[in-house]
Amino acid sequence: MRGTPLLLVSLFALLQPGDCRLANAEEKLMDDLLNKTRYNNLIRPATSSSQLISIRLELSLSQLISVNEREQIMTTSIWLKQEWTDYRLAWNSSCYEGVNILRIPAKRVWLPDIVLYNNADGTYEVSVYTNVIVRSNGSIQWLPPAIYKSACKIEVKHFPFDQQNCTLKFRSWTYDHTEIDMVLKSPTAIMDDFTPSGEWDIVALPGRRTVNPQDPSYVDVTYDFIIKRKPLFYTINLIIPCVLITSLAILVFYLPSDCGEKMTLCISVLLALTFFLLLISKIVPPTSLDIPLIGKYLLFTMVLVTFSIVTTVCVLNVHHRSPSTHTMASWVKECFLHKLPTFLFMKRPGLEVSPARVPHSSQLHLTTAEATSTSALGPSSPSNLYGNSMYFVNPVPATPKSAVSSHTAGLPRDARLRSSGRFRQDLQEALEGVSFIAQHLESDDRDQSVIEDWKFVAMVVDRLFLWVFVIVCILGTMGLFLPPLFQIHAPSKGL
């Protein structure tokens, strides 16, 4: 009767599944390994004080979360795989029912306290202490996930076609090179589980082991994150609007001077470019070491628009000149009225002036003189006077002599002489009045011709500056944006 309970317990143990026995074996193994009498997680796992513990590191990139250009911080989600050997955690698997792998909480074993040295938020260690994987030969593998914010020096020279080299520097916080040795398990970071970024392309992720020649006890492992920006976002939202706004400045030279809106268009374009320049200053870091590429382009276009404002003032000044204020020099006529229009593909419409529109003043003077000389040579009838002068005053043919003679034949001689004298005097005064009007019209024609010449000079200057602006704008844009597109960035070499 006394052996019955013991027999029942033995039968119950035999009927249990194998995993329960295995769980009991793992529990017993953990109790044996982590017994406080034989294991202290604060002591380095070395058989002697001079023994060097080798820590093998391997970084696996999960996600490039963001790169804050203004604060110069890179945020990444990584897994930092660490491997080392702890002889105190080795066991004979045959004594524990073939258990070869044991998972132990990380805080219960010795850790090499490897931290991110160049962190930017004060978080040096990992955020989650996952279990370590311990094998029967004493090798330990720890793969903790972490979200790191690391300091990254942003090079703004080619923004937004830039390529950055941000680093993650890992080092033990309390142990130096005489106690632990950090080595790379692979020359580059692992990207098997990487989630692509919408803003950056990963160019390369080389790792290097750095030893300070001045301090042999210093050693660290550094991973270079060589990333290249995807410029589509900034091209659509910054570069193309800037180019379109700059192209509006070209219309300033094509706009007629008489419309009065040339200066308004120039100032509007300049204000728009100033707004974009202020927008850029909110994105890039406030550094004085270099000027971003988009900033250089905006400054370049602002200089061009300022130049267009100056040229517009000059063109308007030339356009509104007149003979009463300025005299056109001969070289100006030769250069801007004859030579430059040919090279600028400009053709001035010809001025068609009808010769019968108004008699020339010299002809009127000649007619008056002839009329006076005729009266001085001898008495003449009004018919002779008509025949000599009416052709110039009135296009209607003069009255024939026979009609005039028959009209005056019945008058006395003295009356005829007095009548012809008064008629000659009235006719002379009329001719002098017509001569004055002709001279005035001729003077107005000359002044108007000079004014039209000044306006054409202004058009030539406007067209000249138009070609200069277009050529400089195209060459400047290509010179600024083409080199960064074809530039090859070499990754940093380790020491």
UniProtKB/Swiss-Prot annotation:
One term of GO molecular function: acetylcholine-gated monoatomic cation-selective channel activity
Residues carrying sugar: 35, 92, 137, 165
Binding site for Na(+): 261
Cellular component, GO annotation: acetylcholine-gated channel complex; cation channel complex; cholinergic synapse; neurotransmitter receptor complex; plasma membrane; postsynaptic specialization membrane
Signal peptide coordinates: 1-20
Transmembrane regions listed in the UniProt entry: 236-256, 265-285, 298-318, 464-484
Record-annotated site: Key residue for a low dissociation (K(off)) from the conotoxin BuIA: 133, 141
Regulation: Activated by a myriad of ligands such as acetylcholine, cytisine, nicotine, choline and epibatidine. The heteropentamer CHRNA3:CHRNB4 activity is blocked by the alpha-conotoxin ImI and AuIB.
Subcellular localization, as worded in the UniProt entry: Synaptic cell membrane; Cell membrane
Record key words, sorted: Cell membrane, Disulfide bond, Glycoprotein, Ion channel, Ion transport, Ligand-gated ion channel, Membrane, Metal-binding, Receptor, Signal, Sodium, Synapse, Transmembrane, Transmembrane helix, Transport
Membrane topology category: Multi-pass membrane protein
Keyword match Lyase: no
Keyword Transport part of the UniProt annotation: yes
Main location: membrane
NCBIfam families: LIC
Name this polypeptide is given: Neuronal acetylcholine receptor subunit beta-4
Lineage: Eukaryota, Metazoa, Chordata, Craniata, Vertebrata
